Amino acid sequence: YHKMYYHKLNSTQSEDKLVYGGEKEPNRYVSGSVTEDQNYLQIYAGQNTSGRQLYIKDLITPNSKPVKIQGDYFARADVLYNKKRTFYLFTNIDAPNGRIVSVNLSKPNIWKDVVPESENVMFASSGGGYLFVRYLVDAKSQIMQYDLNGEIVREIDLPGIGSAYGFNAKEDEKDLYYS
């Protein structure tokens, strides 16, 4: 049984607190990370390589329980960015080519399209408070910058034909790098 624990530095292991996993969630591999603002824990739980569940735990509210955002083991929903309790997810749910949705923790079953699926395969990232989408168009990358409402800010001009990767940065950063 995979488990995720909270460990406070300079404390003993016996004081660790179980956050997720164990006998109630058998046969899952578990991973997690903290959001950039350090206020939320993203918990991913999977049983295969086709997808994984997503839970988000509020780290500010004492004794909060993880909120299930996505419960399908054969789909993906990855956190790109959060603005307080609103999370921007890249998902393949109802979108084989990918889409970006927003979800508020107070209403985790209500997903709103931010950047809908297109005819081209999509990959997504965030940086500087924006969303970046890399579309695969005619075997080359096309990069679009979106605001958090899904409005196109601009197309990123690339120096030539090829594949571009990267476009990740922290919220307050004004520069980002790609290859």
Kindly give the residue locations of the regions a language model identified:
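Peripheral, non-catalytic segments that deliver or gate enzyme domains
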Residues: Y1-S179
